[in-house]
Amino acid sequence: MGSTETRHPPAMFDWFFEAGCPNSLEEDPPILRQFPPDFQEQEAMQMVPRFCFPFDIEREPPSPAVQHFTFALTDLVGNRRFGFCRLRAGARSCLCILSHFPWFEVFYKILNNVGDLLAQNQVAEAEELLQNLQQHPLLGPRFSGRSEMDSSITVRSECGILPPALGNSKLLSCFVAPDAASLPSIPENRNLTELVVAVTDENIVGLFAALLAERRVLLTASKLSTLTACVHASCALLYPMRWEHVLIPTLPPHLLDYCCAPMPYLIGVHGSLAERVREKALEDVVVLNADSNTLETPFDDVQALPPDVVSLLRLRLRKVALSPGEGVSRLFLKVQALLFGGYRDALVCIPGQPVTFSEEAFLAQKPGAPLQAFHKKAVHLQLFKQFIESRLEKLNAGEGFSDQFEQEIIACRGASSGTLRSYQLWVDSLKKGSDALLHSMKTKTQPAVRNMYRSGDSLQEYCASKAKSGLKGMQNLLTIKDGDSGLQRGGSLRTPSLTSRSDRLQQRLPISQHFGQNRPLRPSRRLKTEEGPSEPLRERSPTLSPGDTQNPWAEDTLDGSFLGSGEELDLLSEILDSLNVETKSGDLQRASQSLDCCQRGAASESCSSLPDIPVGLPWQLEEDKRSQDPQPWSLPGDLSLLQDTPFSEVVSYSKNSCSQPFQQSPPSQGDPGPSLSKLDPRPSQSPCPKLLRVPTRHSPPESPQLLVSTEPNSDAVQRLQSISSPSCSHSAENPRNQPPQVLLGQACVQPLEELGAPTYVSHVSTQQRPQDKQPRVADLKKCFEN
C-alpha cells in the first residue's frame, strides 16, 4: 500500500476501538471501548475517531448494510498507518483497527468476527481474539515486517475453524497473511475488483495517466467501500512506484480544506460532501465520479504517454478487466516495465564505490521519440526519484532483489530486442510514411478538386448544350424521316413502308380544296433528267410472280371504308405524272397507282398484290348515260415494245360489277404533244372521251394478256387534256369529282384473256380542236402545283 512501516513493528496492530456516532459535525465521536486498555497515544486518540464517520451525518441517511472502508495517516517521515473500519448497520457505531500493515482482507475479516461477537454480547471472547492476534509472532515468510509489494500487496486470507486443543473446548479462528511476492488478483483483491466494476476502461487509463503525472486527483462516490477501494486500487496500479504525496482515502468533513492544497494529492470524498468541495476554489484538479463514471481533467495526460503504450492498455484492458486472475495487475506492470525499464542501463557501478544512477545516461537512451519525451518529464517526478532511491539502497546494502517488476523488465527486453522492437520501428516508419503520403496527396488533389469545382458550372452548361443539340438532331432526323415517308406518296406500291394504314390512306388523298377542307401542298416529284435517261421500267419494277404475293411488302391492303368515306382519288396528278414520264421516256409505260387502288378497293375483305405493270391495260369505261355515241380511242405508243413486254395482274371482283379505271398513255418521246396556252373555261357540257367495252373471254389470272396494236392518233392527247382541263372538272363524267361509289357504278373490269386469245380494241376518234392544243403539259402541271 506504499506504507513505510517500522522495520520490525511490535505487533500486528496498534489499537482497536469502537466509536459512537456523534450528534453533529462539530462534536468528536465518543470511544465506547478499546484494546489494549492501556493505549496512551493522545494524538491518535483525539484525531483518529473523527475518520470513522467521513460523511455528512446530518444529511446522509443511515445505511441499512454494513460498510467497510479504510483511511490512512501519514507522519512527517512519510510512514503510514492504515485504519480499517466497519460501519455497523444504521451507522450507530464504527469498529476500527489501526495497523502498519496494509492487509485489507485480513483486517476486514477480523473486524467481522469481532463485530459478531460483540453483537452477541461476547465481549470476553472478542478481547481474547484480539489479544491472541496482537501477541502472535510476526516472524515468518508470510508475516514480514516490510512488504515488498507495498501498495500492491494481495491479501489472500482464509478464515476457518480449527479443531479444539486437548483439554480445551474453545474454537480458534485462523487467518492467513498475504503473500508478499504476488500480484493483486480478481476477485481475491477487493479493491481491484471494485475498481474494474465501478469505472470504465477508458477512465481507468485516464486515472493512471493522471497519477503518473502527479496531478491533484479527487475521487467521489456515495458508497464508502467503493470510494476507498478505488483510491487504494489506483495506487496499487503504480507498482513498483509508490504515491509519495498526500493520500486520504476518505476525507472527514473537518478536513475539506485539504482539497485546496497546492501540492499533488489523492483524496476520496463522500458524495454527501462533494457539493461542499466543489464550492471551494479548485484549480487544475482531476475529478473522477465513480457514481456517474465520468472523468473531468484539464490535462492531456493520456496523450503524453507513448502511443504504443496507450494502445496496449486500451486493447488488452477490455479483455482482462473482468476475467479472474492477475491479468489487470500484470498488464499495468508491463506498462511500467516499458516506461521505466531502462533505469537499469543508467546504473553506474564502480568497484569500491556505491552504485549510482546517471540521469544523463537514462535520457541519452533512444527507445523512440515519444518514450524519450516521456523520460524527460519522468526524471522530475517524485515517485520515480523515490523508486530509484529505494533500489540504490538495496544494492548498496548488498541485498539483491528479484521481484515481479525485474522479471517483467527482462521479459520486455527480450521481446523488444526481437519482434516487438522491430514492430515498434515499423509502426513509427509507417506513421511517418503515411503522414508524408497524406500530405503529398492533399497537395496534389487540392488543385484538381478546386479546378473541378470551378469548372462545374461550365461543365453543366456544356452538358446542357450537348443535350439540346442532340435533341435538335433527333428532331431533324424525325422530320427528315417524315418527309421521306411523305415523298413515297404516289410511288410504287412495292416500296416498303412502315407507316400505318391510316397514314397511307391519308397520303393518297388529293391535295386540293374540297368541301371547305384545306390540305398542304403535294411534295414535288420531278425527275432529274440531267442525270441521264430513266432506267427501264421492267428493271425498276419487275413483274410479280405468284410466290411474291406472300411478301408483306409486295401487297398493300385498303379498307372498304376508304372507298365509301366520301374522299376522292388524285387521278389527275397521276395522269400528269404519267404524261411527264412518257414525255421524257416515250418507250416506257407504267400503271396508275390510284387506278390500282380503286381496283383493290372494289375487292371485299381481300388483299391483292398490285405490281408495277410495264405495259398498258385494256381499261374501258362504261358509256355515259347522256352520250349514246361512244368515242373509242386507243393508247398511243411504241406498239412493238408493248407486244414484247410481259405483264401480270391481280383482278379484284366485286359483288355486282368490277370496274377498272383506264390507263392513259402519253405520246412518244419524240412527240412532245400539243399544248394549251390557257385553261379551257368552258362548262362541263363538253364531251369527255370514253373507252368502248370489248367482249372478252375469262381466263385464269396467271395467263398473260396482250394488247392489239393500234395506230397512234393525235386525238388521244387532245381528249386526255380535255379530261384534265377545268372544263371537265364539274361534269358528272369526270372521275375526279365523282365519289368512289359512282366510279364503281360507271366502271367495269375486263377479265384477262386466255393465252393467245385476241383482244379487239376500237380506234379512237380523230377529232381535234385547235384551241385544245395550245398549253403544254409542263405548263399545265406547273399551274396545278401552284
Curated annotation (Swiss-Prot):
Residues 13-158 form the uDENN domain. GO terms for cellular component: centrosome; clathrin-coated vesicle; cytosol; nucleoplasm. Coiled coil: none annotated. A motif (FXDXF motif) lies at residues 401-405. Residues 481-553, 653-741, 762-786 are annotated as: Disordered. A motif (Clathrin box) lies at residues 570-579. Residues 657-675 have a biased composition (Low complexity). Residues 542-552, 706-740 have a biased composition (Polar residues). Residues 182-318 form the cDENN domain. Its main location: cytoplasm. The keyword Transit peptide does not apply. One of its GO terms (molecular function) is guanyl-nucleotide exchange factor activity. The keyword Transferase does not apply. Residues 320-398 form the dDENN domain. Residues 527-541, 770-786 have a biased composition (Basic and acidic residues). InterPro entries: cDENN_dom, dDENN_dom, DENN_C, DENND1A/B/C, Tripartite_DENN, uDENN_dom. It is found in: Cytoplasm, Cytosol; Cytoplasmic vesicle, Clathrin-coated vesicle. Keywords: Cytoplasm, Cytoplasmic vesicle, Guanine-nucleotide releasing factor, Phosphoprotein. The modification Phosphoserine is found at S565. Pfam families: dDENN, DENN, uDENN. It comes from the Eukaryota. Guanine nucleotide exchange factor (GEF) which may activate RAB8A, RAB13 and RAB35. Promotes the exchange of GDP to GTP, converting inactive GDP-bound Rab proteins into their active GTP-bound form. PANTHER family: DENN DOMAIN-CONTAINING, DENN DOMAIN-CONTAINING PROTEIN 1C. Exhibits low nucleotide-independent RAB35-binding activity. Interacts with clathrin heavy chain/CLTC and with AP2A2, but not with AP2B1. This is DENN domain-containing protein 1C. It comes from Mus musculus (Mouse).
